[in-house]
From Swiss-Prot:
It holds the Pfam family Formyl_trans_N. Its EC number is 2.1.2.13, 1.1.1.305. Pathway: Nucleotide-sugar biosynthesis; UDP-4-deoxy-4-formamido-beta-L-arabinose biosynthesis; UDP-4-deoxy-4-formamido-beta-L-arabinose from UDP-alpha-D-glucuronate: step 1/3; Nucleotide-sugar biosynthesis; UDP-4-deoxy-4-formamido-beta-L-arabinose biosynthesis; UDP-4-deoxy-4-formamido-beta-L-arabinose from UDP-alpha-D-glucuronate: step 3/3; Bacterial outer membrane biogenesis; lipopolysaccharide biosynthesis. This is Bifunctional polymyxin resistance protein ArnA. The lineage of its organism: Bacteria, Pseudomonadati, Pseudomonadota, Gammaproteobacteria, Enterobacterales. HAMAP family: ArnA. InterPro entries: Arna-like_SDR_e (IPR045869), Bifun_polymyxin_resist_ArnA (IPR021168), Epimerase_deHydtase (IPR001509), Formyl_trans_C (IPR005793), Formyl_transf_N (IPR002376), Formyl_transf_N_sf (IPR036477), Formyl_transferase-like_C_sf (IPR011034), Lipid_A_modif_metabolic_enz (IPR050177).
Length: 660
């Protein structure tokens, strides 16, 4: 049976050996070039392929049409992936009549995503395993073909568990590959309600936070022990690595991070104490704990910290242009909840942010970005992270004021992008789900979906193409001039403070605010073209949490990434949104203050928006990049969002002249 294999690491090597032993004909192997910054303790797939006289390739992008065509020419009957680090596109899966299968290092559906070996140890699991599953477009989500369980012993560290998993994988493949070859397999669908997903880990993720329980810190040490980069902490500005540890149920009133004793080297934690058994100062040699204490100059009562002392004091400065807007004011609230951000904001109004104006770490100037260019340039230079959130983003304005949309959304933002390039500042840019346009994919994917818009004589697309061109400019600056960036695409975020009822009165608001105004005023809810268009509605709290994680950028995982932020489970038509909103309105305690419901009215889009409008039938995001980069998934049900949004707006209405 002819196969093409995607493989890396020890699992890749043993997978190839298992295929050959089972009588498969391997036409080609795709692997990766080794990362010079990574400690290579594992077998080389490239070397094995060369020894077995099998063609081997390591393209930067195996999903490029040229590589897809070359794989098609190999006519594989089945495809296998063994720890290949990049997602493989659906077009490649479809080349093999028998399908594609992936070996994953966990008991799926638990621990989908990256680094499951390390994550199960970080989380203190007592069992994991290996899974062979059918590959589908969503990573690690296909039907399970076979699994083997692996017990995790209390003294297991990453390398010992790795060896256990390799042994289990070898057994699993020996049992399963002949059955796949003969088409004799039983597949079991994964239980989505049990799925968990974890993202990529980097060395910077392994710092020891001493306020946590000693057992949690010990698990971190186990998860990244040699040959992984190791868990680390600081004495002042001196970094040291902890290679092995023990948990002590030491009852101490010492502050977390305090040295309780130096022989043994015992550190107070949020609960209990951690003994550092072996460790290493800087790039030095490994030594036992008491010698390490001497090397670091530690005495009883010394304090350790999770980051260098020189960097622990300075807050990250975040510049938010459009801070009074829907995203801007909610993001400000989230940032100020932490103690390590300084927020600088500019907007033409301050009604939504009035609650922050006296906060010591919030600095606001009222102004227009098209006028206050000097202030903006100075603050781009001064701040660490820039979020240009100013844009006209209401559909009726795209046809009513297309030139103004272009001038503000494109020209003004391009100037800010160039400031970020000039001063080498990180930019987090709000693209839009509108860039996908009339894409026909079931799930809109950041890396593979085509961006399809209508003809030039439909000005409705000026917002979409303005944003898309800015996305491409930012990407090019990142590639050519090293701009540090992340693009995020909100999918129909909604919640309190989304526009306002006055904006809705002139038609310049998003859908839910317009519908609430209709209920408040007793006017018919207008369903444009019947309201059958489907959207995926995302609670503002879910969206802001994802955006906050982009700003945090743990391990720089978000650099150069395009990330959809939406809730694919909250899909509803505009008509369904209206019906859910009406039901919530009818049972609201303030309902008796408002006129009777005036019904639904179907309106043609050309009458409502103008002749230059086109609509999109569906818009559902793939959120695999959000899973991978942010360890994020939305949690809030659409009905809860509707209830809270409605309640917020109803309580802003002056009820003195309403019927009771």
């Amino acid at each position: 049976m002819k196969t093409v294999v995607f493989a890396y690491h020890d699992m890749g090597c043993l997978g190839i050996e298992a295929l050959l032993a089972a009588g498969y004909e391997i036409s080609a192997i795709f692997t990766h070039t080794d990362n010079p910054g990574e400690k290579a303790f594992y077998g080389s797939v490239a070397h094995l392929a060369a020894e077995r006289d099998i063609p081997v390739y390591a393209p930067d992008n195996v999903n490029h049409p040229l590589w897809v065509e070359r794989i098609a020419q190999l006519s594989p009957e089945v495809i296998f992936s063994f720890y290949y680090r990049h997602l493989i596109c659906d077009e490649i899966f479809q080349l093999a009549p028998a399908g594609a299968f992936n070996l994953h290092g966990s008991l799926l559906p638990k621990y989908r995503g990256r680094a499951p070996l390390n994550w199960v140890l970080v989380n203190g699991e007592t069992e994991t395993g290996v899974t062979l599953h059918r590959m589908v477009k969503r990573a690690d989500a296909g039907a399970i073909v076979a699994q083997l369980r692996v017990a995790i012993a209390p003294d297991d560290i990453a390398i010992t568990l790795h060896h256990k998993l390799c042994h289990a994988a070898r057994q699993l493949l020996e049992q399963t590959l002949p059955a796949i070859k003969h088409g004799n397999i039983l597949e079991i669908a994964q239980r989505e309600n049990e799925a968990t997903c974890f993202g990529r880990r980097t060395p910077d993720d392994s710092f020891l936070e001493w306020h946590k329980p000693a057992s949690v810190l010990h698990n971190m040490v186990r998860a990244v022990a040699d040959p992984w980069p190791g868990a680390f902490s600081y004495v002042g500005n001196q970094k040291f690595t902890v290679w092995s540890s023990r948990v002590h149920p030491h009852a101490s009133k010492a502050q977390p991070g305090s040295v309780i004793s130096v022989a043994p080297l015992l550190i107070a934690c949020g609960d209990g104490a951690l003994e550092i058994v072996t460790g290493q100062a800087g790039d030095g040699i490994t030594m036992q704990g008491s010698q390490l204490a001497q090397m670091l100059g530690l005495v009883q009562g010394s304090r350790l910290n999770s980051q260098p002392a020189c960097t622990a004091r300075r807050r990250t400065r975040v510049l938010i242009l459009g801070v009074n807007g829907f995203i801007g004011n909610h993001l400000t609230e989230r940032l100020l909840r932490e103690d390590h951000y300084e927020v600088y904001g500019l907007d033409i109004g301050s009604d939504a942010i009035s609650r922050f104006l006296n906060h010591p770490h919030f600095h606001f100037v009222e102004g227009d970005i098209s006028i206050h260019s000097e202030w903006i340039e100075y603050h781009v230079k001064k701040c660490d992270v820039v979020l240009p959130l100013v844009a006209i983003a209401t559909p009726i304005e795209y046809t009513r004021n297309p030139l103004r949309v272009f001038e503000l959304d494109f020209e003004e933002n391009l100037r800010i992008i160039r400031y970020c390039v000039k001063y080498r500042k990180r930019i987090i840019f709000p693209s839009t789900s509108e860039v996908y346009g009339m894409c026909s994919d079931k799930y809109f994917d950041e890396d593979h979906s085509n961006l399809i818009v209508g003809p030039v004589n439909k000005p409705r697309w000026i917002y979409s193409v303005s944003k898309q061109l800015l996305d491409r400019v930012i990407w090019a600056y990142g590639e050519k001039e090293g701009l540090q960036f992340t693009l995020f695409l909100p999918f129909n975020w909604m919640g309190p403070r989304l526009d306002n009822l006055n904006a809705a009165r002139i038609g310049s608001s998003r859908a839910i605010t317009q519908l609430i105004l209709n209920l408040v005023e007793g006017s018919p809810i207008k369903l444009i073209d019947g309201g059958k268009q489907k959207r995926c509605f995302t609670d503002i709290r879910d969206g802001i949490e994802a955006l906050y994680r982009i700003i945090e950028n743990a391990g720089n995982r978000c650099d150069g990434e395009i990330i959809n932020i939406g809730n694919p489970e909250n899909e509803a038509s505009i008509e369904e949104l209206g019906e859910m909103l009406l039901a919530s309105f009818e049972k609201h305690p303030l309902r008796h203050h408002f006129p009777p419901f005036a019904g639904f009215r179907v309106v043609e889009s050309s009458c409502y928006y103008g002749k230059g409008y086109q609509d999109v039938e569906h818009r559902k995001p793939s959120i695999r990049n959000a899973h991978r980069c942010l360890d994020w998934e939305p949690k809030i049900d659409m009905q809860e969002t509707i209830d809270e949004t409605l309640d917020f707006f109803l309580r802003t209405v002056d009820l003195t002249d309403k019927p009771s």
